[in-house]
């Protein structure tokens, strides 16, 4: 069984689909249907523990995704899964080229200017049409575009910090 640090959040169960226990899935992957390519899924329980779940089917449905799990054969059983995060083992993720990172690895990093001034911590990220955006929580919230080599000068996952070319007054 994987440890909690070995599971990377990749989506969430967001609703029910039909009467046979299928669920609607919101995917953080790009493209969104790539989450269906991962063979091992885990669900995060309310207590924070990740538990393995066997996905028996999954497909694109309209503008979203739907999935079925073993032993979940009706809406009542499927309802218990709504709101649970979907994670995959880190070992299943492909290696990324330099300058690209999984969001889960960036969340929680301490952010500093190139001059060493603290800006806060990366609380989360979101995607825009142009680029991803870091949301920093510190003395105030800051939104910083994630543009490697420009606003993002250095990422040190081992040290838990990210260096940004960013005016602390902005």
Curated annotation (Swiss-Prot):
It holds the Pfam family RimM. Its main location: cytoplasm. It comes from the Bacteria. It is found in: Cytoplasm. The keyword Chaperone applies. One of its GO terms (biological process) is ribosomal small subunit biogenesis. Residues 98-170 form the PRC barrel domain. One of its GO terms (cellular component) is cytoplasm. GO terms for molecular function: ribosome binding. Keywords: Chaperone, Cytoplasm, Ribosome biogenesis, rRNA processing. An accessory protein needed during the final step in the assembly of 30S ribosomal subunit, possibly for assembly of the head region. Essential for efficient processing of 16S rRNA. May be needed both before and after RbfA during the maturation of 16S rRNA. It has affinity for free ribosomal 30S subunits but not for 70S ribosomes. This is Ribosome maturation factor RimM. It comes from Alkalilimnicola ehrlichii (strain ATCC BAA-1101 / DSM 17681 / MLHE-1).
């Amino acid at each position: 069984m994987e440890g909690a640090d070995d599971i990377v959040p990749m989506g969430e169960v967001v609703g029910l689909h039909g009467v046979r226990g299928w669920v609607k899935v919101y995917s953080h992957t790009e493209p969104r249907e790539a989450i269906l390519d991962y063979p091992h899924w885990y669900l995060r329980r309310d207590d924070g523990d990740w538990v393995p779940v066997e996905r028996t089917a999954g497909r694109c449905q309209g503008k979203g995704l739907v999935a079925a799990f073993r032993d979940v054969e009706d809406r009542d059983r499927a309802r218990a899964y709504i709101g649970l995060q979907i994670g995959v083992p880190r070992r299943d993720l492909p290696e990324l080229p330099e300058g690209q990172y999984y969001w889960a690895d960036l969340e929680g990093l301490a952010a500093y200017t190139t001059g060493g001034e603290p800006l806060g911590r990366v609380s989360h990220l979101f995607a825009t049409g142009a680029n991803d955006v870091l949301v920093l929580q510190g003395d105030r919230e800051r939104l910083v575009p994630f543009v490697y080599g420009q606003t993002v000068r250095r990422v040190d996952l081992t040290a838990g910090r990210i260096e940004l070319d960013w005016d602390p007054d902005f």
